[in-house]
Swiss-Prot record:
The lineage of its organism: Eukaryota, Metazoa, Ecdysozoa, Arthropoda, Chelicerata. Expressed by the venom gland. Residues 22-25 form a propeptide. This is U6-lycotoxin-Ls1b. InterPro entries: Spider_toxin_CSTX_knottin.
Amino acid sequence: MKLLLFTALVLVVISLIEVEAENERACIPLEKECTKTPGNCCSGLKCDCYRRFEQGVAKGIQCWCIEKDVTYKGI
């Protein structure tokens, strides 16, 4: 019985530590790059990705944290 209670207590402590670590993770602010961590933009922002071309040749993808529900158009 003691072993069961001890095991339950250890599991509760471990889960609390994991939740606290996730809450401390810093978010990415507006207009900062989020290519490597797309799900880490601050609240109210989304990670929007674009394929970059140089002289018609694809040079990779870059992602930025932008405001939700905002659309950007080329000029």
